[in-house]
């Protein structure tokens, strides 16, 4: 009697690339649902409907609806903090550093597209997970800015001055997002004066007399009128 070996039937084992693709699909669906409904309107049912996946598939990767949202918020923080860190390593000239920091902030916001609206709507809501991520990002940015001031041999800004500058940037970027239709780029006629407002405020809160004197020679910051 000959021995017969039968192959195991069933679905083939998922590759790492396939698993990452499904995970990314869930995270993208979470972003879409969050954009429409905010964190309070986030549910597994809506995420799997958006992703076109079965519920067991979702739970193979995430335990609840908040977990993929945390992935999104972590990426958002890394993008903002990393962008500002890169901006502050690109120059040793104080005024240019301030401008680069602002442009990093604006670039981060533009990269979020329509998701920026619910993100900003929940920044100051203690019940939202977005709020905790905001605090972490701000603390990382404070640390990065202080380290750059020390590296340049400049007096470290007071906590109030630094927070005033960062909160102003945050607010202006929010205003830009509120004035921009979902999925569209900010109107250049709105973006240019908003960027200029941030530059002027950073100069006066974090800069020195020498910085202001230098900036006064730049007519695009302070027109000669």
Segments predicted by a language model, with ranges:
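C-terminal peripheral helix-coil segments that are non-catalytic and often amphipathic
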Residues: 1-9, 107, 143-150, 175-225
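Short hydrophobic/aromatic patch on the recognition helix
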Residues: 52-62
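Amphipathic alpha-helical segments used for helix-helix packing
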Residues: 109-128, 146, 174-181
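Basic, helix-initiating cap at the start of DNA-binding domains
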Residues: 1-37, 41-50, 67-70
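Amphipathic alpha-helical packing segments from all-alpha helical-bundle domains
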Residues: 78-82, 108, 128-153, 159-175, ...
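Short, hydrophobic secondary-structure boundary micro-motifs
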Residues: 43, 117-120, 131, 185, ...
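Alpha-helical DNA-contacting segments of helix-turn-helix folds
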Residues: 34, 62, 66-76, 119, ...
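Hydrophobic alpha-helical connector segments
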Residues: 71, 85-111, 165, 192-195
């Amino acid at each position: 009697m000959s021995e017969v070996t039968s192959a195991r039937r069933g679905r083939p084992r998922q590759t790492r690339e396939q698993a990452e693709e499904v995970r990314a699909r869930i995270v993208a669906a979470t972003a879409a649902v969050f954009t429409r409904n905010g964190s309070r309107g986030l549910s597994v049912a809506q995420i799997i409907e958006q992703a076109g996946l079965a519920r067991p598939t979702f739970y193979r990767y995430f335990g609840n609806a908040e977990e993929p949202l945390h992935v999104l918020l972590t990426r958002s923080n890394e993008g903002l903090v990393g962008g500002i860190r890169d901006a502050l390593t690109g120059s040793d000239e104080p005024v240019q550093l301030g401008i680069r920091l602002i442009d990093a902030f604006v670039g981060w916001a533009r990269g979020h597209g329509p998701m920026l609206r619910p993100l900003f709507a929940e920044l100051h809501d203690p019940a939202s997970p977005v709020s905790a991520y905001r605090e972490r990002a701000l603390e990382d940015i404070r640390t990065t800015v202080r380290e750059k001031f020390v590296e340049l041999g400049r007096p470290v800004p007071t906590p109030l001055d630094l927070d005033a500058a960062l909160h102003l940037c945050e607010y202006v970027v929010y205003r830009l997002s509120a004035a921009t239709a979902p999925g569209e780029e900010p109107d250049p006629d709105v973006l240019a004066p908003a960027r200029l407002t941030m530059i002027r405020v950073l100069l006066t809160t974090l800069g020195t007399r020498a910085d202001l004197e230098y900036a006064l020679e730049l007519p695009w910051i302070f027109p000669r009128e």
